[in-house]
Amino acid sequence: MKVRRDPLDDLFSFYIRTRAGWKCERCGRMPDRRGLHCHHFERRRKKSVRWDEDNGVSLCFGCHQYLDENRDEEKAFMIRKLGQQGVDMLKARTRAYGMPDRVLITIYLKQKIKELENDN
């Protein structure tokens, strides 16, 4: 079952890739913008962490494909990125009840993007 994308997904993806400096966080490549993806450690259907910044990482197409197909490698990458405690905390947040506040998330992401753009 494919999860439908919406404007908040696009904003989240833009933030994650901007935060990474428009580079792949696994191999360091800088593909064009269409070749750089926002990968979710915990899949997008888990609404409680769908737009959680710890759940997103910027990957080139090749690394995205590789981690999607190699879950053990994805887990190892996730631990290197977040640390074991960060991974455990993210997993705990997947079990949160209720719907995320989409308006608040939108405001937060726009502010974070603005801060990143002002730093450059």
Labelled PLM ranges:
Residues 25-57, 67, 73:
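Histidine-centered nuclease catalytic patch
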